[in-house]
Amino acid sequence: MSKIEKMSIQGVRSFGINDKNKQVIQFFTPLTILVGPNGAGKTTIIECLKYMTTGDFPSGSKGNTFVYHPKLAHETDVRAQICLQLKDVNGEPVAVQRSIICRQKGKSTECKTVDCVITRIKHGGPVSLRPKCEEMNKEMISALGVSSAVLNNVIFCHQEDSNWPLSEGKRLKGKFDEIFSITRYSKALETLRDVRMKEDQNVSNYQEEIKYLKENKEKAREIQDNLQSKEKQLTVSKENVKSIESQLEPLKDRLADIQRNLFKVIRLENEIKALESRKRTMEQDNQDLMEKMEKVFQGTDEELNEMYQNQCFVREKERKLNDHQREMDRACKESQRLNREKGELLVQQGHLQLEADNHQRYIKTRDSLIKSLAVQLELDGFELTPFNQRQTSNFQMLVKERQEEVEAHANQILREFSEREAMQQRQIDEIRDKKTGLERTIELKSSTESKKHTDLKKVKYDLQQLEGTSDRLHELDEELQKTAHALENVEKSCNLEALKGEVVQLQTQKSELDRNVRELDQEMEQLNKHTMTRTQMDMLKNDKADKDEQIRKMKSRHNDELISLYEYFPNKKQLEDWLYSKREDINQTRDKLARLTKELVAAEQNSNHLSNELCQKEKQSASFEEKVFDVCGSQDFNSDLSQLLEDIEKTSKQRAMLAGATAVYTQFITTLTEENQPCCPVCQRTFPSEAEVQDVINDMQSKLCLVPDKLKAAEDELKRKEKRKDEMMELKPMRQMLSDLKEKEIPEIRNKLEAINREIKRLQNDVEEQESLIVTFVSEEARAEACLQDISLMEQYQMELRDVDQKIAHYATKLLGVDLNRTVQQVNQEKLEKHHSLDNVSRRIELLQNHLQNQQEQVQQLKSRVNELTAEKLHISSNLQQRQQLEEQNVELTTELHCLSIEIKESREQVFPLESTLQKLQQEKQALLQRKESSYREAQEKVNDIKEKVKKINLHTKDIEKYIQDGKEEFKEQKESELQELTVRLNECEELKEKINREMVTIRQDIDTQKIQERCLQDNLTLRKRIEELKQVEEERDQLLKEMGQMKVTQMEKEYQELENKRETLKTNHSLTLGRQKGFEDEILRFKNELNEPKYKDAEEEYREKMIVMRTTELAIKDLDIYFKTMDQAIMKFHSIKMEEINKIIRDLWCSTYRGQDIEYIEIQSEPDEGISAADNRRTYNYRVVMIKGDTELDMRGHCSAGQKVLASLIIRLALAEIFCSNCGVLALDEPTTNLDHENIDSLAHALVEIIKSRSRQRNFQLIVITHNEDFVELLGRSEYVEHFYRIKKNIDQCSEIIRCSVSSLASYLH
């Protein structure tokens, strides 16, 4: 059983927020009493307990008023913390802490829980967790062992909600439904009903699904058989393909070798032709070069190379020209670099000039500021500018001294005013201390006066009470005698031994019923254990019936078809034999068809090959004709070529003549010019006059001028014709090939193509005939195969039926010894009857035990009453002896009060003149502070003005000094000198560029003159090189002819044709086999895809699992019906039993507590809700509290007084706590004496003591009573169950304090 041990409170309502204000309360067992005046904070403790256990703030506050208000704390955020130490239902220690923060936002406050910590002891040490608030609440409910509704409405019920048992009907119903958890159980029943309806619907759905799953299962078996057949055919086809490929591979290798050799032959032929053409071209080029040369060198190669090397001075000239060009480039780069440096120097010079101008401006500004400040500070010697360094330093020193004087003056003013202010403050403090002392004296004496008044009232009250004590003493003697007599009569009338014997007999009967219930539980467990076996057996029987029906349907479906093929209904073996023979016929026909198809494909391939070859030959012929026409311009190639050769020869001679004319004319002109008496160089005749000589020379020179142009034109024409000749020579082999194509190759291909087309028509007719025959055979085979699948399935079903029979026999063996006539429902009904009998016996035992306990309690109550009366008699006797002492205290207190009143009046008269004097001094102090502030501000402004001007002067002085220290003036002069020097160097560089340019022009002229002679030597070198290359070409041609003669070209071509024919045959077979294989693979893929479809993939497994699910679901629906009825009956029974127990406790507590005669007892009546239909199946109740007067019962709400209402609510809470708090012995009563008269308060105290006494055997029982009625506390304190109580009061800071007090001190406090 759980219990609470200790709690600390800080920052909640009136409990302070500082650590010193933290209050700790330890809860006693079995009774904890909290007493204090209204507003002291008693109910706050109940609110804290409720918040710690449920997480709920007090109603209507949302936590905003639960925490110490931020305005009272003068803070924006206020934190509150509550710690609770308890033991859970297992007796384990648990510490819980919750922290709250309240934040002021404008006029409103916001409060929330910021931290939750729960600490447990695990593995010998504390373990702390920080769960969320909702998880924390669940942890607390689990630790305490009671629901949240019981914590809120029974255990920790707030004073404002304590009368909820007499609230209006809807609210009362809600409270009791929460306590009984009616809503939760009703929802459980609704959930059971919903689950059952859902499962009913599921069974219907399962039946529909099973129908389709069964069809899918059968279809999947059919597809699987077809797949296996096609896979076997595919395996055979793959083996055929491998065999053909193994024959093709060596053929391909050999053909590739031959083809490479043939390509090599063609390449050699092309290379030989190219070499021959190149040889002719080279010979012609050499001839042309010799004709073009003026003189062919007759010496050796060494002599020619030596002469050519002697011409190297041209190279030297060119090298020198390149050197001059590089010097020119360097001079240009140097000129560009000097120009860039000149530009950079000009930019630097501009910056330096700008800095010099700024330097002069800074000097003028600084001197102006110095002169102005000197006039302001009345300093002499600074009238004339500019100032030198010495004057500037002297000025700064003088200004510093004058500045220190001004600051010293300002500080002097500040010290004088501070001294006067301190003296004024001392006077104020003296008068304030005197005034405060008088006020404190008045406060203390007023407090003492108030306390004395209270003591005086108490003394007078005690004296008044003692006036009737003698009569009360007499009454106590009479009542004590009556109670002792009643106790003696009750002890004689009790028959306790007989009651105990009957209880023992009933307990024996209860043990026997317990044994019967356990036996039924074992039988129920045995039946449940074999439920699955019985289900499996039923499913197997259903499966057997289904398979029998499938076999019958298959026979009726294929009977006509099979009889038409075989004249009887065959078995699987007979049908497979027939199919085998039919497939042999199909294979033979297919082989024949394949052979014909192969021949047809080969013929078609030959036809296509010949067609393509014909097309290529025709295209090649047209291409050759087009090329010949493009080059020749006509189809007469030979005549065009002869004409072209004649033109080339004529042009070559003309070119040679023009080339020689230049040398001849030059020699003639030289001869005619140099000789004194020249003669004609041709006819050797002398010229009659110089004029004729000159005419001849002029004529030769004019012709000589025309020779270069004519020579160039002749060379161009010769090159053009040579190029055309080369193109025509290249076309000569093409011309021969064109003739062969037209006259031989194309007519032969056309004849072969016509013969092959006739063969193709014959083969097509044969293929069509074989294909129609295959269609007939395949149709018969397909019909037989369609039947074969079902026949195989029939035989499989027959085998499965044998397995099913064996399984049925196996399950029947397992169920031997099990009473199949007793069902789970029968055993469950018998178990319910035994439980009902057991409950009746248990209630009878409990009734007898309660009766026995009541008699024992009655005796104990009478004994307790005798003890109480005796104690009260002794107490009254003691009080009578204290009367003289109380009268003396009355006189003493009256005298002290009179003296205190006079002293307070005198102190108040002394306070008034001190207040006026204090006010006057404070006004004088304020005026002094204003003058002090004004004077100091004026002096400070003067100092700041001087500092600002000095700062500006220092800044300009710093810039001036920096310019001088950096040497900017010298740097400026240096850059100007560098600029002049750079200008001189730039002019020198330009002069050098002019000189180099003149030398380069001279060298170029010399080089052009020498290149003509060098060209002649170069032509001789080229001719000799070409002759050497021609020899190499002839040797290479001879080598290729020799290599080509070693290869057997004709034999290779024949072998290539034979191997090609064989390869085409194998390729045709390979294509046909691959085609069939592709068909098999497509069918296999189609079958596999069908099997991989969701409806076929696991069709049989899904069918079996769905059947199991449907059967088990049907059984579960039956169990749900049983459980629903059982649970509904259990809820009704639980509710009625608990209400009987609650009403019994209420009746006993009312009779023992209520002292009036108008109400015999009260009880809670629960009635089913008439507004709920029977179809809804929800058990709901309406509750009302009634009071019994004779034979009449009335609703207590509206018919009872305020005191009766409080007492009834309290008793109902006590009864609910007795019933629902078996795991938690805590109960808190907040102001239970509200609206009760004195007699009912006494009886309530007596009832609580009796409850404590009856529950004292429970080690963790705790009753917490909060009250302001100290008489009620005193009555509870008379019992032996309480030694200390807590007094709640507020301290001087108006913060709540919890003080532990002894019960023995309560009497002295009261009296």
Swiss-Prot record:
Zn(2+) binds at residues 680, 683. Residues 634-733 form the Zinc-hook domain. One of its GO terms (molecular function) is protein serine/threonine kinase activator activity. Residues 189-341, 473-613, 711-1069 form a coiled coil. Belongs to the SMC family. RAD50 subfamily. ATP binds at residues 13, 38-39, 41-44, 67, 159. Its EC number is 3.6.-.-. Keywords: ATP-binding, Chromosome, Coiled coil, DNA damage, DNA repair, Hydrolase, Magnesium, Meiosis, Metal-binding, Nucleotide-binding, Nucleus, Telomere, Zinc. This is DNA repair protein RAD50.S. Pfam families: AAA_23, Rad50_zn_hook, SbcC_Walker_B. GO terms for biological process: chromosome organization involved in meiotic cell cycle; DNA double-strand break processing; DNA strand resection involved in replication fork processing; double-strand break repair; metaphase chromosome alignment; R-loop processing; telomere maintenance via recombination; telomere maintenance via telomerase. Mg(2+) binds at residues 43, 159. Component of the MRN complex, which plays a central role in double-strand break (DSB) repair, DNA recombination, maintenance of telomere integrity and meiosis. The MRN complex is involved in the repair of DNA double-strand breaks (DSBs) via homologous recombination (HR), an error-free mechanism which primarily occurs during S and G2 phases. The complex (1) mediates the end resection of damaged DNA, which generates proper single-stranded DNA, a key initial steps in HR, and is (2) required for the recruitment of other repair factors and efficient activation of ATM and ATR upon DNA damage.
